[in-house]
Amino acid sequence: MEKIVLLLAIVSLVKSDQICIGYHANNSTEQVDTIMEKNVTVTHAQDILEKTHNGKLCDLDGVKPLILRDCSVAGWLLGNPMCDEFINVPEWSYIVEKASPANDLCYPGDFNDYEELKHLLSRINHFEKIQIIPKSSWSNHEASSGVSSACPYQGKSSFFRNVVWLIKKNSAYPTIKRSYNNTNQEDLLILWGIHHPNDAAEQTKLYQNPTTYISVGTSTLNQRLVPKIATRSKVNGQSGRMEFFWTILKPNDAINFESNGNFIAPEYAYKIVKKGDSAIMKSELEYGNCNTKCQTPMGAINSSMPFHNIHPLTIGECPKYVKSNRLVLATGLRNTPQRERRRKKRGLFGAIAGFIEGGWQGMVDGWYGYHHSNEQGSGYAADKESTQKAIDGVTNKVNSIIDKMNTQFEAVGREFNNLERRIENLNKKMEDGFLDVWTYNAELLVLMENERTLDFHDSNVKNLYDKVRLQLRDNAKELGNGCFEFYHKCDNECMESVKNGTYDYPQYSEEARLNREEISGVKLESMGTYQILSIYSTVASSLALAIMVAGLSLWMCSNGSLQCRICI
């Protein structure tokens, strides 16, 4: 009878109603790194490092770049005859110059403060070329004879289009005194130059006067130049050299020129009609007839990610450049399907729901939820409230990280002349240092936020478990694996009340108490039965052993194998 009661009790325990708390799992193979672990598989993740580009030069916010092709900035501004396609250019978003353009200063020489001029151009989006001193106004000097085979055009000698090389006329070079007053509302970029002959004979041949000078003055500029006559090696067939200068003439200011030889006079100037963010980008790419918000020398980036690893030099609304190869943010949970046992490991920032052995692939409509089983069946149900709060929290966190890191950031190359190489090297070291710091900060941020996110999910599962536990109290038994076993019948309506937090503890407490006491009594009674059976079994086996030993002894004595002596 006792065995029958025990068997019925066991059967009733197996068929008890249950509710379990768990979390979502899927077939994702996405992996993230945290402070504590590497390559943690998660249900959802978001890459925040852009690694792709289109390999083209594109319009920036609908404005085309000025692609100088085989011309340099100097060749464009002075008017190298091979750069005639850039005589008048529309508004540009940025300027593209090749690393070693073929059409630079056709007549050999130097461009003074060239790097500073390029820096100025990085804040200009449009020039308007205007004539300030007409070529025809030089009646006392030869304005058309100043050409060179170093600057050919259609097989003939020519010269820079925007300046005039003045030569003596009728064996005389009268002293020049010219002024130009800037009556425009915009600043003017004005260029001029000086010719340095190869020897004294060339000096008098071109300018008649053996000793010459050039004076240039504005409200902020006071310059006096003299030619440097010296024997030099030929470049582009020329032993002479030319040196070019520039200045910005403010509105209502005047520029004054005085010279008695070697003067390369301005004919055209550039009115700065639009200022803005621009850049001079070194690139060999071709125009791709495309549009972008971020351009690099390697190609355009169209991405909302906060970081990229394509090229450190950029123009536009660009992510920050880092040296990392991988930056992935966890947005979902640890992906540990139920077939795999979960390691009970505590995170860095909070408690982990390590009592749950694995996630549920059957629960697809939420991150956290329930699995129940009763006489009416079984099924999964997501906890929509906790899931939505978690989604909002993680989404806000990811957006916050992206917003904080996605500030408008431009990094354009700086150019230095030969005398500034030490400054250039120091600048490169500083920029490399900044990139190292940015990279370290980005990687550390991702590691810490991933740790927080995973612990945040674990904490939410534990909170859901505690919510159920506090409702059920002693009306159910904790099984230690995230499940509760009811001491009373719990139909679907009852299960739903547990899930939505309206479980009526008093309604089921009496039934639960009786079932709990009955199960406890069965356990005690069955324990007493087992004790009696064990004592009986011990005594019986001992008695049987004694009889066997006595019988064996008598048999051995009877056949002489064993001698028995009784001493009194």
Swiss-Prot record:
Belongs to the influenza viruses hemagglutinin family. This is Hemagglutinin. Glycans are attached at residues 26-27, 39, 181, 302, 500. Residues 1-16 form the signal peptide. It comes from the Viruses. Residues 17-531 are extracellular. The record marks 346-347 as: Cleavage. It is a single-pass type I membrane protein. Homotrimer of disulfide-linked HA1-HA2. It comes from Influenza A virus (strain A/Duck/Hong Kong/2986.1/2000 H5N1 genotype C). It is found in: Virion membrane; Host apical cell membrane. Binds to sialic acid-containing receptors on the cell surface, bringing about the attachment of the virus particle to the cell. This attachment induces virion internalization of about two third of the virus particles through clathrin-dependent endocytosis and about one third through a clathrin- and caveolin-independent pathway. Plays a major role in the determination of host range restriction and virulence. Class I viral fusion protein. Binds to sialic acid-containing receptors on the cell surface, bringing about the attachment of the virus particle to the cell. This attachment induces virion internalization either through clathrin-dependent endocytosis or through clathrin- and caveolin-independent pathway. Plays a major role in the determination of host range restriction and virulence. Class I viral fusion protein. Responsible for penetration of the virus into the cell cytoplasm by mediating the fusion of the membrane of the endocytosed virus particle with the endosomal membrane. Major glycoprotein, comprises over 80% of the envelope proteins present in virus particle. Keywords: Clathrin- and caveolin-independent endocytosis of virus by host, Clathrin-mediated endocytosis of virus by host, Disulfide bond, Fusion of virus membrane with host endosomal membrane, Fusion of virus membrane with host membrane, Glycoprotein, Hemagglutinin, Host cell membrane, Host membrane, Host-virus interaction, Lipoprotein, Membrane, Palmitate, Signal, Transmembrane, Transmembrane helix, Viral attachment to host cell, Viral envelope protein, Viral penetration into host cytoplasm, Virion, Virus endocytosis by host, Virus entry into host cell. The lineage of its organism: Viruses, Riboviria, Orthornavirae, Negarnaviricota, Polyploviricotina.
